[in-house]
């Protein structure tokens, strides 16, 4: 595993030393020192899968330029990239013509190709989207047509008998079969991106929480103005360290709106954290599930619904629910950050969403606290699953972008900035699922936008 960390230097209490493993295996550790005047052509903020994929793509395209990745945690992929279902999505759900649809379909092929080239294990276990009620059949048909419009490969429709041939324990009336949907450890993929970036000459700094961006001309310090002739942007950290660069790209995930605001962007769309709690099938019951089993999405509700997800380690995750997290990194019910919570509740868009889906939200909280209630939803698809067959599993936090009217922003969003720094910053504002599947395709788009916006 690629691990990086900052340590205080014995020679200088304000300088930081980076420990960077040169490969995923963790061998061949070398030590570098981050100087207060470190200079780069481009700094990428965010060491998750989108940030690392973007850094990799940029250094492949521009090997003569200097790049660094700045990550606030002690390790890479600590949040959404390391807390997800592990599904390689096919692209069936998304609005035809949207970036989500386009980049997911591209990303699926790129992901399998990348994993093959880098010997990263995956399983192409497929997915069933199952209609269990008459009213879901028209929705299933519409979803099938949407997948075709999006260019999703090899989709078929099967009846009850066909469902049983694929998933013997699953009940349903009709189902869409997506044979190319798969599973992978996305954290492992992200670390491989980071390793590619490092091998290309890039630097990765962890423990570097970005607190502000400024152009040299915005500062009263003549030294910064002089440095600004070639590297006008200063990136400040909570450790009082600075990095100077020509351009900045942010892939901040749960903090993307706050990072964008630092360059003068509108805070909207606002990021609101939603926690998803999973159950896990006991090992002796994992034979009940062979591949991914998903419900037909209900257009009356904002989230996908509970599903069955096999994992690379042989376990099976069930869920998740979707509830407001009380902290942007709130993986447990009692994780509370007063700033995050006040920020969310003060936002008109969240209040609108809560009002519109109040009963849905109450049900989600209840199912998160009551295994039997969650299992009851799952029994629609596999009736033989009981509450005794499951245990509490992990949780993840989703960075959901909302507009001020309470609508979920359903597509990827890119933004710049205003003022002197505006032309030197590019923000990935909204990159929810299927961002992991789409990561290599997103990286290509970000690199294209950077080439247009910046002088690289």
UniProtKB/Swiss-Prot annotation:
InterPro entries reported in the protein's UniProt record: FAD-dep_OxRdtase (IPR006076), FAD/NAD-bd_sf (IPR036188)
Coiled-coil residue windows: none
First and last residues of the transit peptide: 1-20
A Pfam cross-reference name: DAO
Leader sequence residues: none
EC number: 1.1.99.2
Gene Ontology, cellular component aspect: mitochondrion
Cofactor: FAD
Matches recorded under SUPFAM superfamilies: FAD/NAD(P)-binding domain
Molecular function GO labels: 2-hydroxyglutarate dehydrogenase activity
Designated name of the protein: L-2-hydroxyglutarate dehydrogenase, mitochondrial
The organism of origin for this protein: Nematostella vectensis (Starlet sea anemone)
């Amino acid at each position: 595993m690629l691990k990086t960390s900052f340590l205080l230097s014995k020679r200088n209490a304000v300088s930081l030393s980076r420990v960077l493993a040169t490969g995923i295996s963790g061998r061949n550790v070398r030590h570098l020192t981050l100087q207060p005047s470190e200079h780069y052509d481009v700094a990428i903020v965010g060491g998750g899968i989108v940030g690392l994929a973007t850094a990799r793509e940029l250094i492949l395209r521009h090997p003569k330029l200097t790049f660094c990745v700045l990550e606030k945690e002690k390790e890479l992929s600590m949040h959404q990239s390391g807390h997800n279902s592990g599904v390689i999505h096919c692209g069936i759900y998304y609005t035809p013509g949207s970036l989500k649809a386009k980049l997911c379909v591209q990303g699926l092929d790129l992901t399998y190709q990348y994993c093959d080239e880098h010997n990263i294990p995956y399983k192409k276990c497929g997915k069933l989207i199952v209609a269990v009620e008459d009213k879901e059949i028209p929705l299933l048909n519409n979803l099938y047509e949407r997948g075709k419009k999006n260019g999703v490969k090899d989709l078929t429709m099967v009846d009850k008998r066909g469902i049983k041939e694929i998933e013997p324990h699953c009940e349903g009336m009709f189902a869409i079969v997506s044979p190319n949907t798969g599973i992978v450890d996305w954290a492992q993929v992200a670390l491989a991106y980071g390793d590619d970036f490092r091998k290309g000459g890039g630097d990765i700094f962890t423990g570097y929480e970005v607190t502000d961006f400024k152009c040299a001309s915005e500062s009263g310090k003549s030294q910064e103005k002089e440095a600004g002739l070639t590297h006008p942007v200063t990136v400040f950290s909570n450790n009082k360290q600075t990095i100077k660069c020509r351009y900045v790209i942010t892939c901040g995930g749960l903090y993307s709106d706050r990072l964008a605001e630092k360059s003068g962007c509108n805070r909207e769309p606002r990021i609101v954290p939603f926690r998803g709690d999973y159950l896990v099938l006991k090992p002796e019951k994992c034979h009940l599930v062979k591949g991914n089993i998903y419900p037909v999405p209900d257009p009356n509700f904002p989230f996908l619904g509970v599903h069955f997800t096999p994992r690379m380690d042989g376990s099976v995750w069930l869920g998740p629910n979707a509830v407001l997290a009380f902290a942007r990194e709130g993986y447990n019910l009692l994780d509370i950050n007063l700033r995050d919570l006040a920020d969310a509740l003060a936002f008109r868009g969240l209040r609108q969403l809560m009002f519109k889906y109040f009963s849905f939200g109450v049900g989600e909280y209840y199912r998160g606290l009551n295994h039997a209630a969650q299992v009851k939803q799952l029994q629609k698809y596999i009736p033989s699953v009981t509450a005794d067959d499951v245990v509490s599993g992990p949780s993840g936090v989703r960075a959901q972008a909302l507009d001020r009217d309470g609508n979920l922003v359903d597509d990827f969003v890119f933004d710049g900035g205003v003022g002197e720094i505006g032309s030197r910053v590019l923000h990935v504002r909204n990159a929810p699922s299927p961002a992991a599947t789409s990561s290599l395709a997103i990286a290509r788009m970000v690199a294209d936008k950077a080439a247009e916006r910046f002088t690289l």
